[in-house]
A protein has these predicted regions:
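Conserved SGNH/GDSL esterase-like catalytic core that processes O-acyl groups on lipids
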Residues: 58-61, 101, 127-132, 170, ...
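Residue-level detector of flexible, active-site-proximal loop/helix-junction positions
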Residues: 101, 164, 209-211, 297, ...
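Surface-exposed acidic, glycine-flexible loop patches that form ligand/cofactor-binding
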Residues: 147-150, 236-247, 279-285, 362-366
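Sec-exported extracytoplasmic/periplasmic mature domains
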Residues: 165, 199, 203, 256, ...
């Protein structure tokens, strides 16, 4: 079992079309390995391999970089088809990069002249939708130069959760299949939205379908939150995360949706497991504010019991049990999502961020 090495987590990218759908190499100067911490800053959990590649598995991981040149490309190995990235350059609205299964070079930017650019490359997909490996970045054949990457914010947030925290369905469009991977976009999830509003870094430690004690199907012997929280890559138990690499100022936990999917879980079991998990998180970040959020999906429905009311009651009891001013409840309303899918929409993620922002500003003094 190994600990993940973590260069400062962020890189960069940009584009002129809305979707890069095919791989195409860019003529370049000698490529720069993706693990160079003087050139690339990474935000989010990642693992550096012995070969110097940088692997991502959690949603929202972002690479930040700056360069002077007229072209930029990245070599990516995707474990699955349809891995999507938002490519943001110089503050412009992002373009979308699609990576297909396997190894390929992808153009990120091609300009008419040499210029200085700042780029961010962000993983959109949920955790279960496949790991991606960044191998190297390349400048164009014309004169190019790597510049020091942009400094990351000093403030640090972390959000632990399920598919809601991943940003599932946040980018859904009615013309698109509800199962399409393009519907996910961690960059505009509530956690990353509120982090940008507060001028903070953001780590999303989240996995769709998982809970505190059981997943959405009621399965207990899978990697639920207490297990995947310890990992650099959510589906690789051999790669442990070194919590000293990133110590948040505040940690939001939104869990319970999947625990309650098969019915109301036993009170003592759920509360005890949740308390133990928060205590572990507090040991890793002793000074952090921890705020427990209601599920925006769980609802009181005829035939399914008062699930929302019970979950809220459990959370209240957890806060009392922990007995610390640094552990608080952050109430959230229910959001209906779209017909036939209860995940919050993009507008509803904006609303959740709007609920959390004033609370965090007040409690953190930000």
């Amino acid at each position: 079992m190994k600990l993940a090495k973590s260069p400062r987590c962020w890189l960069a990218v940009a584009a002129l079309s809305s979707v890069f759908a095919s791989a195409a190499p860019v003529s370049s100067n000698p490529p720069m390995p993706a693990n160079n911490p003087a050139i690339f800053y990474y935000e989010g959990r990642c693992d550096v391999t012995s070969a110097g590649d940088v692997r991502w598995g959690f949603p929202g991981v972002t690479a930040h970089l700056r360069f002077r040149g007229d072209a930029l490309a990245v070599k990516i190995e995707a474990a699955e088809d349809d891995l999507y990235f938002d490519v943001s350059m110089d503050g412009a609205p992002p373009a979308i990069l699609r990576a297909g299964k396997g190894v390929a070079d992808y153009p990120l930017f091609k300009g008419d002249k040499v210029g200085e650019h700042t780029i961010a490359l962000t993983r959109r997909n949920e955790s279960w939708q496949g790991t991606c490996t960044l191998r190297e970045f390349s400048l164009g054949a014309t004169a190019g130069e790597w510049l020091s990457p942009p400094e990351l914010p000093k403030r640090k947030l972390m959000f632990i959760g399920d598919s809601v925290t991943c940003g599932e369905m946040v980018a859904y469009e009615s013309s698109r299949d509800m199962r399409a991977k393009l519907n996910s976009n961690a960059r505009i999830s509530y956690g990353m939205l509120v982090a940008r509003r507060l001028g903070a870094q953001c780590h999303l430690v989240s996995y769709g379908g998982r809970g505190i004690i059981r997943d959405w199907q009621g399965i207990r012997d899978t990697r639920n939150a207490p297990q995947f929280y310890e990992l650099a890559l959510p589906d690789d138990p051999a790669v442990r995360w070194d919590h000293s690499r990133y110590v948040p100022d505040a940690i939001g936990i939104q869990l319970g949706t999947n625990d309650f999917n098969q019915g109301i879980p036993d009170q003592n079991e759920f509360i005890n497991a949740y308390v133990q998990f928060v205590e572990k998180v507090r040991r890793d970040a002793p000074q952090a504010l921890i705020f427990l959020m209601d599920s925006p999906i769980v609802n009181d429905e005829p035939g399914r019991g008062p699930r929302r009311a019970v979950l809220h009651s459990y959370l209240e009891q957890i806060v009392v049990r922990l007995g610390s001013p640094k552990v608080i409840l952050a109430p959230l309303p229910r959001y209906p999502g779209v017909p036939n899918n209860g995940h919050p929409t993009g507008a509803e993620h904006e609303a959740m961020a709007g609920e959390l922002e004033p609370l965090l500003r007040r409690v953190l003094g930000w």
